[in-house]
């Protein structure tokens, strides 16, 4: 018998291995329900400046309000069906590998949901500002610098890129720094000359990069942790486990994320 707690623990382990969500989310909120309403506050301008206040004068206020539209939470999951013979005669280590892979697939789907919100917003008219390179199929270092500079007053400390954009970036002369190469070979982690952590993911469309300030860009809303429902079909000698998790994403500050697209060649 595959115990539900063993299944849930193995799936969670797979979700945590190589999970990029902690690198792009500013906060995690646990919420019981299917619809969630986040908060908003305008960044920049007079509403955020700490100006000098004369004696007896009113202190400028920053107003935090709930968003106009709800954030919808989605259920992601997989049904695991195992025969009596598979459970009876195989080692648990083999099942752990399969369960970790299921967890990895769920994590990829959650990342795809996060990318969708970063690019198009969460339904509250907060899609990311987008820019495009001048040359077709070409990404220059000057364009990366301009993209980085557009984040003020935020800081671009994380850069999500598709595989083809990563290849274009690695071929730039500015990325040939020996220390950058040594760090990449030793740890597998690559930092850009602009100081942002570079994360490659297959869930991004081709020719796309998303820059963000991970401190202010995205909120992860968890409706439930990994849940396992277990039963048996005695007449067929099958054991089944439904593995599900409910979560969604809310965009906190619109200016904390931007999209850079390499013009199609």
Label the predicted regions.
Residues 75-81, 156, 238-240:
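Broad gene-expression machinery/nucleic-acid interaction feature
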Residues 66, 143-147, 225-228:
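Glycine-rich, charged/polar anion/phosphate-binding loops
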Residues 83, 161-165, 213, 252-255:
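Helix N-cap / beta->alpha transition motif
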Residues 76-151, 262-265:
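Alpha-helical scaffold segments that mediate packing/assembly in large oligomeric complexes
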Residues 120-190:
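Extended, solvent-exposed, turn-rich assembly/linker loops in the middle of proteins
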Residues 1-76:
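Assembly/oligomerization interface modules of large self-assembling protein complexes
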Residues 173-265:
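Sequence/fold signature of self-assembling virion shell proteins
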Residues 48-51, 90-91, 168-170, 250-252:
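Short helix/loop capping segments that flank catalytic or ligand/cofactor-binding pockets
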